[in-house]
Amino acid sequence: MNQIEKTGELSASRFTVRDFTELVKIGIVNSNTITAFTGMWLAFQLNGISFIQNVDVIFFTIVGSALIVAASGAFNNVIDRDIDGIMERTKNRPTMTGKISGKRALMVALVLGVVGTIMLFMTTWQAGVLGVIGVFLYVVVYSLYAKRKLVSNTVIGSFSGAVPPLIGWFAVEPSFSIVPIMLFLVMFCWQPPHFYAIAIKRKEEYAAAGIPMLPVVKGIERTKKSMFFWVILLTILPFFMFELGIVYVVLATLLNIGWLALSIYGFKMEDSIKWAKWMFVYSLNYMTILFVAMVVISIFL
């Protein structure tokens, strides 16, 4: 038993709600639950399905989605214990301070994952399968392999991060249409510029931990070009979402133009760290405004 495990056993009584929320990465849980809800809401609204008469579906979808994302975060914390202590932003995670032992964190992850998956299967089998795929992609493909081995790790990790809105949609309407595809693509294209902004700010930490993030391997200027590329892709997507109405298309386009302008400004701005902070903040506001707008605008369609 290593020192972290010993400390974890001794401090088990100090396992608090805050420790739990840090273990499951509550911020990521919240943001992914919002996208899952949006997918579910749009499936109700655009297919003429009663929201009120499907309270059970709503409950199982939202809670199930939150639980599998929480499980994925906990699994990731267990896997990353060898590198979390090196990085400033992760060195105080409960699995590093000993407040939660590796064994206990693994048990929490397994329980959350199993319960969440069962709940998703109680909606439709498609939603359940998507949940399993999402966890597998994040835990096995990304956390265990791509994150540590490939410079394309962020793009690969974006597949799992784009699954929640699909889960929400398929829990209600288990068939493909342009809207769930676009929701997936929005989330997929949004993640690289968002996480590359973090990687630029934390470049030295990632380098010390041996994580081949794009800024570490290819440099900041190359990363700026990649971020610009992904934002350009985002600017195209609203024009495939006229089913949500012209108001949404205009709003999304304006948000995209703003992000595109900020991306271009990065090539002229000398302080790349400050620019990366701006990009990070913009990405958070972008996602929040965009998905809230989808929900609100769809009410009036």
From Swiss-Prot:
GO biological process: what's one of them?
Answer: heme O biosynthetic process
Any idea what this protein is called? Protoheme IX farnesyltransferase
Asked if RNA-binding is a keyword of the record, the answer is: no
Q: Which PROSITE patterns match?
A: UBIA
Its encoding gene is what? ctaB
Q: What Pfam families does UniProt report for this protein, alphabetically?
A: UbiA
* Protein family according to the UniProt entry: Belongs to the UbiA prenyltransferase family. Protoheme IX farnesyltransferase subfamily.
User: In the UniProt entry for this protein, what further remark is given in the free-text comments?
Assistant: Carbon 2 of the heme B porphyrin ring is defined according to the Fischer nomenclature.
What would be an example GO MF term here? protoheme IX farnesyltransferase activity
Question: Which GO CC annotations does the UniProt entry carry?
Answer: plasma membrane
Naturally occurring in which organism (per UniProt):
Listeria monocytogenes serotype 4a (strain HCC23)
**What is its quaternary makeup?**
Interacts with CtaA.
Does the UniProt entry include the keyword Lipid biosynthesis? no
Q: Tell me the function of this protein.
A: Converts heme B (protoheme IX) to heme O by substitution of the vinyl group on carbon 2 of heme B porphyrin ring with a hydroxyethyl farnesyl side group.
